[in-house]
Amino acid sequence: MNQAFWKTYKSKVLQTLSGESEEDLAEERENPALVGSETAEPTEETFNPMSQLARRVQGVGVKGWLTMSSLFNKEDEDKLLPSEPCADHPLAARPPSQAAAAAEARGPGFWDAFASRWQQQQAAAASMLRGTEPTPEPDPEPADEAAEEAAERPESQEAEPVAGFKWGFLTHKLAEMRVKAAPKGD
């Protein structure tokens, strides 16, 4: 289809949606000064990185999103998000005692929680396939585990991933969900 067809179609659709008459549209076409130059200004959502990510992820499908979101619950969200500052100004520095308490009370990180939940679900799925009852594993205390690892290995902690969790595994699963959700062609 050519561009003129789409312009005509668009004007007809806009006309029916807005309720303008054809005479008003013809008058605007004849006198372009009546039509203000409408510059397409980008909305706030266009610059928001989360909305850009959401647009990219939308091809994953509902099933994949539900699978990923089932790994987390409201308690995790409350633990992972920092509490709002209680000072008069949001940029004001916290008192040292409050900052130290917040650092100590902080639980496992986002990816630590993700990895442990993922492993628990995989173990449960494997035991269901074998026909046995899944045994829930308690989450290890992250502070104790980190202290033990630091005592055992004084070298860099970033050398190995947490509890054998590989980033390649996560990316493989995401790609696998995307392929399953993609429409099948001829």
UniProtKB/Swiss-Prot annotation:
Residues 136-149 have a biased composition (Acidic residues). Residues 90-105 have a biased composition (Low complexity). Residues 17-47, 77-105, 121-164 are annotated as: Disordered. Coiled coil: none annotated. It comes from the Eukaryota. This is Uncharacterized protein C1orf232.
